[in-house]
Amino acid sequence: MKKRQVAIEDLFETKSVTNPVLAPNDSEAVFTVTELNRKDNAYYSAIHHIELETGAVTRWTYGKQQVRAPKWSADGKQLAFISNRSDTDQLYVMQKAGGEARALTNCTEGIDSFEWSPCGKKIWFSGAVRTGETFSTTEKKEGKMPQPIRVTNMKYKADFVGVLPQEVYTQIGYVDIATCAVFDFTSEPFDHTLEAVSHDGKQLVIAVNRNKNVDHDFSLPLVLVDIETKNETMILDEQGYFGEVAFSKDDRYIAYTGYALTFANVTQADVFVYDQSNGQTMNLTAGIDAPIGDESISDHLQQTIAPGVVWTEDEQLYFQLSSMGDVRLYAATLDGAIYPATGEEEHVYGYDVATNAEFALLTVSTMTNPGELYRQTIATGERTKLTSFNEDWLKKVELVEPETIHYTNGNTNVQGWLMKPANFTEGETYPLIVEIHGGPHAMYGFTYFHEMQVLAAEGYGVLYLNPRGSHGYSQAFVDAVRGDYGGGGYEDIMAGLDEVLKTENWIDETRLGVTGGSYGGFMTNWIVGHTNRFKAAVTQRSICNWISFFGVSNIGYYFTDWHLQAGMKDVDKLWNQSPLKYAENIETPLLILHAERDFVCPIEQAEQLYITLKDLGKETEFVRFPESDHNLSRTGKPNLRIARLEEITGWFKRYL
């Protein structure tokens, strides 16, 4: 069968295989499969079960719903998960022996997360509760007249949501599985995050900041709580982002991941272990100059829930690590030994490890495979493919294999990837599109990226790079962008373009395009304001004015401080690094794409840029996406994701 080129509509053909979770017996597992439904314009997911000895896969849940975070009871006889089948996220449990899943909660605001009690008779969970109410409150106040909202803190907005509900806090409770009776464990007017439950069922680790003013407080202390007495032991109280807690098998050690604000929010994450016997904490990964976790970005994967760490019975810890475009599984011992457990040039976006560390279950994507489930023997590296959800689609389409490139810009080494157009013919010349990722502390890597394949299928070469500010190349490299927006990162991108123009004679340098989102949108705006070498540009969810961003974005006031190293007391610096200042220089036709419920990079940024360019008589158009937030390209409504890609390809087709 002759293969066809990738199409925008293939978003509906590929499936996202994620979240493998081994049963306590290590002989079976569950995982989640998510797909886009064209008719309902929705995402639906289902839990699947696999017998590892036979490879038999069985679908366990059905219906038009999303399910997430399946977890086994300690005896392996029950499986709990969160589902939105009743509109709000609630907790459900099903028997391994069979039968329909049963709802355990009916909380007014839904639930966020949960952990089994090892006794198997109750489940701990967290969720939002309004002041004066409990998890058992079921009455919704209908027909209430609109009321003014009094805001007294600076962190009062969230992406898509907008203004956050007032007097609502995340609390922790538990539900009796037999009776569905729900009990409240916390009630203080602070947000409580459920992190972990000990294997003996006597302790919780929760995260809670009890400071009343958190405008400039970025701590979320980890607290060890005795369930019976509610006595607390502080594990960590430091400015930064920490979590993903896991008890060792004997409960002596408590592992967690995260980072302090040494380099603001671009500090590389590490794996820490707290020893209950002496109250000491060790950093297991301090010697690795790369971030713990998955920093790779793509537009295909859904619900990529991966544990921060997994303990084995011999007190080894397994975790993800992002480096040089790879996301690999690593292992560490308490005496400091660290080694990779998987290979290079792939994206291990989900995993679980057998108790005896004999094997791991992995969900893995590559540049030409959206992802499947695998079993890998730890000692030998031998790998067996367990699922084939995307196999039929892969048989139908011709994917382009990106080529890894390395180049230098002065003393800076930069990695990137170059894709030739589909159906490339030697001797012909083609237009090239430069893609720029957001963050800026993110990482392009060895993973499937639908947008890149679509552009190649449309006849474009694609160049995507990890310039300064990207994760995966050292702490100094990712930190280099702070205080230098539009500086070294811009130069790295231009140097990468110059490099491929020098080495690849198929690129038509008179037909260059550029696009990017978030920081990539900022950089797109900056580029067209500082060079006219591009013939078309598409800026997405972008920033053009740091002065207004400071007060309008939900992260504005601290992000500008951390990244621009300036605030409203240094307006000149904010304006000098604002692309809007250079709007008069823009000669490149610019398409502006923005989501209306983006509160990270608010749509007012796009509005300012559009009106300014129109007023100056520049070639520009503005497309607004309703009911969409900052994550439109990844998790937006399917029809709008399709429309977005059509807008991008249509603009480049018009001008290139």
State the predicted function of each range.
Residues 45, 128-175, 209, 220, ...:
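Predominantly five- to eight-bladed beta-propeller fold
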Residues 52-55, 95-99, 176-180, 226-230, ...:
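Short loop/turn segments that connect beta-strands within beta-propeller blades
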Residues 14-29, 64-80, 108-123, 159-164, ...:
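Conserved beta-propeller blade repeats
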Residues 467-656:
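Active-site-proximal cap/loop segments of hydrolase catalytic domains
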Residues 19-21, 124, 149, 159-172, ...:
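Non-catalytic accessory segments flanking enzyme active sites
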Residues 39-44, 85-89, 163-168, 214-220, ...:
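Short, solvent-exposed loop/turn segments at conserved positions within beta-propeller repeat blades
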Residues 389-510, 517, 551-552, 558:
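Cap/lid segment of the alpha/beta-hydrolase catalytic domain
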Residues 6-10, 58-61, 102-105, 181-186, ...:
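A short beta-strand motif characteristic of beta-propeller blades
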